[in-house]
Amino acid sequence: FLVALYTFR
């Protein structure tokens, strides 16, 4: 899920 990676930016 891209949102999960975005939250870890």
From Swiss-Prot:
Entry GO CC: extracellular region
Maturation and modification: Contains 6 disulfide bonds.
Secreted is among the record's keywords: yes
Tissue/organ expression: Expressed by the venom gland.
Cellular localisation: Secreted
The keyword Disulfide bond is annotated on this UniProt entry: yes
GO molecular function, one term: toxin activity
Keywords: Disulfide bond, Hemostasis impairing toxin, Secreted, Serine protease homolog, Toxin
Similarity section: Belongs to the peptidase S1 family. Snake venom subfamily.
Function: Snake venom serine protease homolog that may act in the hemostasis system of the prey.
Protein's UniProt name: Snake venom serine protease homolog
Organism: Crotalus atrox (Western diamondback rattlesnake)
